[in-house]
């Protein structure tokens, strides 16, 4: 075992003394040492229930014959950090989390890992660490929140209802009482936000790839099932250690293709593009951005999930969950190992029934193509991403007038000031991985667009990214980003921009000679943040095209 490095031999007497100083008895020293990386915090609804799950994981590890050690990992809530300086830190924490898990596991020679996670950047950070370390690992996602409840059977979704309610209130569509009802009911308790936003999409994809146990991706945070899954995961990690089952045996090219297909079939968050690219890089799997678009043309969307549709995570779980989706996808799914021990197709075959109102058959899709499309053109030579499942038919093709803003705050001021009108294309730039820095989510501007009733007449493009709660004609991840001199930096007020999702085009309708002249006089702006962790991050982070990973190259 790896832990023998710190447990065996006379020269390890000091190491054993320190371990015994934590209370570990001699009788437990020959057992596998299992690290439980927990992202518990009482700052985030998605993580506030983890203390209970920690207990069940620990019981499972001891039942399976291992010895559990806990160590802490930070958690940032994208909802709380949205719309202010805090959002600069969200995506960078993914890299911090991966580095922290690696550091603790290597420094203490842990034999295996249980990765307790839930919210947006924490799950991909944990998976990046697992793939990088390649020691036996299993993921436990803490589960989604129940839908909020209102009068007359109304169900609330935190992301769509609260952010869009803010814009509707500002526009005079709803009053202060209705706004308050939304605020008080949108988050009824613990769990990740209720729709198919980034946290829940990543939980689903983690199960799809085989890195968590069946039902883990959809079982509600409040459920007894989630606790049983936590216990079983604790038992299972000891088995994985004894049989030397490692993440790279599971995180194969087939696993990533399955994850992308499930993402497309459900209309999941566009952030998964960044995260799957980053995880694949750590796993040594070649996964070009174009893969998402290739598979989107072959994979129909078969579920109408919130935010763009009517169903919540509790509906998906009851309707068949991840394995139900895999069963409906049928021959599109590739067989692959899982931490459970059964293969992907074996697990899918155990599903007895699927609620076809929630998870439709391939013969009756919601849309003929999957939920994410990748666009190219002179505005995005290295690609841009759109969640096409959230775009109305009227906006799949659109030509409009550029309204240029060099920050999210400037764009929000224009939106709330009534300066954006039908026919505009809102351009938010210098918000990419380097330029932001941190590639902030533009949920506030996109929710404001929808709340103001402009979702069918105004488009938004950015080198930043979007929340999983974003819907509407919103194009993100534009690469190269403005801070690197990408074409989005050359757009000027009044330019015409063409968005053509069916033909995968994003074009700036300006002569090349004019663009060359603009490029010749372009100079990079001063960094927005010059000190601290983010200043260092901006120097080593790469393009959205490669997953916005950090690199020393």
From Swiss-Prot:
Q: Name one GO molecular function term.
A: 2 iron, 2 sulfur cluster binding
Please name every pair of cysteines joined by a disulfide bond in this record: none
Role description: Functions in the biosynthesis of branched-chain amino acids. Catalyzes the dehydration of (2R,3R)-2,3-dihydroxy-3-methylpentanoate (2,3-dihydroxy-3-methylvalerate) into 2-oxo-3-methylpentanoate (2-oxo-3-methylvalerate) and of (2R)-2,3-dihydroxy-3-methylbutanoate (2,3-dihydroxyisovalerate) into 2-oxo-3-methylbutanoate (2-oxoisovalerate), the penultimate precursor to L-isoleucine and L-valine, respectively.
Which organism encodes this protein? Geobacter sulfurreducens (strain ATCC 51573 / DSM 12127 / PCA)
UniProt KW Amino-acid biosynthesis keyword:
yes
Q: Which positions in this protein are listed as binding Mg(2+)?
A: 78, 120-121, 441
Q: Which GO terms describe its cellular component?
A: cytosol
> Which Gene Ontology terms describe the biological processes this protein takes part in?
isoleucine biosynthetic process; L-valine biosynthetic process
Record EC number: 4.2.1.9
Catalytic activity reads:
(2R)-2,3-dihydroxy-3-methylbutanoate = 3-methyl-2-oxobutanoate + H2O; (2R,3R)-2,3-dihydroxy-3-methylpentanoate = (S)-3-methyl-2-oxopentanoate + H2O
Tell me what this protein is called: Dihydroxy-acid dehydratase
The UniProt entry annotates the active site at: 467 (proton acceptor)
Q: Which gene encodes it?
A: ilvD
**What remark does the entry make about the cofactor?**
Binds 1 [2Fe-2S] cluster per subunit. This cluster acts as a Lewis acid cofactor.
- Name its pathway: Amino-acid biosynthesis; L-isoleucine biosynthesis; L-isoleucine from 2-oxobutanoate: step 3/4; Amino-acid biosynthesis; L-valine biosynthesis; L-valine from pyruvate: step 3/4
Identify the keywords attached in UniProt to this record, alphabetized: 2Fe-2S, Amino-acid biosynthesis, Branched-chain amino acid biosynthesis, Iron, Iron-sulfur, Lyase, Magnesium, Metal-binding
Which amino acids does the record list as binding [2Fe-2S] cluster? 119, 193
List residues modified as N6-carboxylysine. 121
Q: Which family does it belong to?
A: Belongs to the IlvD/Edd family.
Class of this enzyme:
lyase
Pfam families (UniProt xref): ILV_EDD_C, ILVD_EDD_N
Assembly and partners are described as: Homodimer.
């Amino acid at each position: 075992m790896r832990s023998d490095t710190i447990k065996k031999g006379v020269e390890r007497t000091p190491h054993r003394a320190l371990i015994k100083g934590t209370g570990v008895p001699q009788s437990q020293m020959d057992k596998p040492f299992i690290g439980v990386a927990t992202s518990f915090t009482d700052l985030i609804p998605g993580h506030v229930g983890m203390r209970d799950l920690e207990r069940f994981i620990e019981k499972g590890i001891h039942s399976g014959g291992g010895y559990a050690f806990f160590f802490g990992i930070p958690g940032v809530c994208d909802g709380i950090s949205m719309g202010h300086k805090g959002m600069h830190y969200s995506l960078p924490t993914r890299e911090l989390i991966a580095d922290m898990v690696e550091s603790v596991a290597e420094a203490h020679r842990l034999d295996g890992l249980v990765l307790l996670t839930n919210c947006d950047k924490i799950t991909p950070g944990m998976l990046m660490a697992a793939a990088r370390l390649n020691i036996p690992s299993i993921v436990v996602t803490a589960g989604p929140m129940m839908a909020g409840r209102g009068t007359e059977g109304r169900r609330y979704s935190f992301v769509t209802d609260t952010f869009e309610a803010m814009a509707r209130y500002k526009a005079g569509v709803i009053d202060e009482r209705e706004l308050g009802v939304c605020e008080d009911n949108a988050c009824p308790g613990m769990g990740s936000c209720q729709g198919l936003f980034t946290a829940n999409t990543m939980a689903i994809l983690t199960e799809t790839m085989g890195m968590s146990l069946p039902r883990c991706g959809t079982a509600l945070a409040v459920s007894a099932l989630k606790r049983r899954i936590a216990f079983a995961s604790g038992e299972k990690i000891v088995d994985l250690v004894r049989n030397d089952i490692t993440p790279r045996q599971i995180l194969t090219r087939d696993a990533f293709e399955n994850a992308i297909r499930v993402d497309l079939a459900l209309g999941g968050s566009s952030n998964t593009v960044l995260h799957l690219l980053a995880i694949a890089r750590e796993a040594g799997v070649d996964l070009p951005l174009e893969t998402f678009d290739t598979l989107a043309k072959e994979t129909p969307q078969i579920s109408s999930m919130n935010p763009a549709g009517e169903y919540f995570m509790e509906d998906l779980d009851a309707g068949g969950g991840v394995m139900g989706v895999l069963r409906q996808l049928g021959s599109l799914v590739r067989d692959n190992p899982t931490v459970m021990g059964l293969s992907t197709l074996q697990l899918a075959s155990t599903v007895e029934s699927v609620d076809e109102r929630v998870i439709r058959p391939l013969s009756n899709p919601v849309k003929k193509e999957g939920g994410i499309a990748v666009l190219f053109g002179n505005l995005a030579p290295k690609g841009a991403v759109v969640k096409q499942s959230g775009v109305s038919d009227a906006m799949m093709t659109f030509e409009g007038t550029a309204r240029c803003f060099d920050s999210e705050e400037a764009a929000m001021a224009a939106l709330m000031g009534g300066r954006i009108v039908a026919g505009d294309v809102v351009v938010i730039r210098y918000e990419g991985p380097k330029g932001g820095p941190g590639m902030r989510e533009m949920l506030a501007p996109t929710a404001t667009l929808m709340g103001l009733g402009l979702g069918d007449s105004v488009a938004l493009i950015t080198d930043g990214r979007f929340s999983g709660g974003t819907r509407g004609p919103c194009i993100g991840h534009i690469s190269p980003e403005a801070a690197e001199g990408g074409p989005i930096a050359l757009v000027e007020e009044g330019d015409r921009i063409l968005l053509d999702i069916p033909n995968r085009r994003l074009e700036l309708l300006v002569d090349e000679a004019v663009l060359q002249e603009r490029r010749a006089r372009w100079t990079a702006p001063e960094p927005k943040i010059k000190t601290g962790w983010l200043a260092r991050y901006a120097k080593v982070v790469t393009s959205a095209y490669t997953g916005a990973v950090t690199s020393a190259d």
